[in-house]
Amino acid sequence: MAQVLLHIPKKVHQAVWTQLLPRHLRSEEAGFMYVSHRPQDEAEVFEYVDWYPIPSNGFLHRSRYHFELTDETRARVIKQAHDLGTSLVEFHSHAGRWPAAFSASDLLGFQEFVPHVWWRLKGKPYLALVVTRTNFDGLAWLTDPRTPQHIDGIVIGGSVLTSTKLSPLKYSTYEQ
């Protein structure tokens, strides 16, 4: 299986992490990155095109442990990806001091949202990252909307941040 790498300029990385992880994180923050897909010999490379931070009125609900976007927000980010001809990368933050991993509610949300985005963007890959103050985890749906694989790293300049890879690739654990 090829590595999955997300390339982000250093200034963009700093801005994204600052937005997602404010000094006093009262609830999960979220945003979407628009990326171009550049398959290479040994890696699936996704390169930054644009960033959209979700404003407070873009959430239907959010807390320290869960968020839900408004229908208008979901439609807006999907339409923008369609107009740009890009894939979407969902980013959101988790509070706390434990290593980054998607929660059960995150994984269940992917079961509904990823197939919808996959259909709307005509089979373009979908990526999702969860970030904490110390690390990140990520999943990528490259070949179909039901089979994720881990994101290996984020390339920032000459450095690579590696994923915790703590999130399960199968949802059956959470379907009981």
Predicted segments, located by residue:
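Conserved beta-strand-loop surface patch within small alpha/beta domains used
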Residues: 1-89, 96-176
